[in-house]
Amino acid sequence: MALISVKTILTSLSLFHITLAFFFFTNPETIADQALVYMLGEAMGMPTTTKFNVPSPATSLLAMVLLSVGLSDILSLSMPEEVWLVHHWGSQAPLRFLFFVVVLATTWLGAPSAPRRPGANGIMSRPVAVAGTGSGGGWDGMRNRVVFTLVFVEMLSWFWVWVTLREEARALQDKKRRRNSSGGDRHL
């Protein structure tokens, strides 16, 4: 059995999304100045960006998306346990994990300091990311420390949810099987 239940992890992750939504809407620089963003950015050679210094239409849209995801995820936990544990999150957790793995790989491999990228200054160079000016279109706006850290934390969180979910779903199925087998003996 897991130390922390999947319901607790999902509730915490939903509240994390709602909190991020507040900061992206009101003051995105607060997120960009976090120690975790700095440490992961430095360790992975991700460029800094000035796009999170003031609220913008993009950060406001991100805030609304995070708010809706956080609220819908926390509301999904009010369904019956078997429905959200097995059916809803059983498919959502691996899909979200896979999505964030792809976005993380694209963000890191497409960064100006990524290995094997033409014109890269080296793995540990830290240029300032200028969003939307390169040939990569919208992907260039995602190649920075803030996005990398957010996607990295999301990927780790969804992997944790997925692993814990599988354990708890298996335990729920075993409990259901035992209950059905003991219930059938009483009728004989």
What are the language-model segments listed below?
Residues 32-52:
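Perimembrane loop-to-helix junctions flanking transmembrane segments
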Residues 30, 34, 38, 78-82, ...:
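Membrane-interface elements of multi-pass transporters and channels
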Residues 45-67:
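Interfacial helix-start motif at the membrane-water boundary
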Residues 18-32:
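Alpha-helical transmembrane segments of multi-pass membrane proteins
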Residues 3-8, 13-20, 59-62, 66, ...:
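Eukaryotic polytopic
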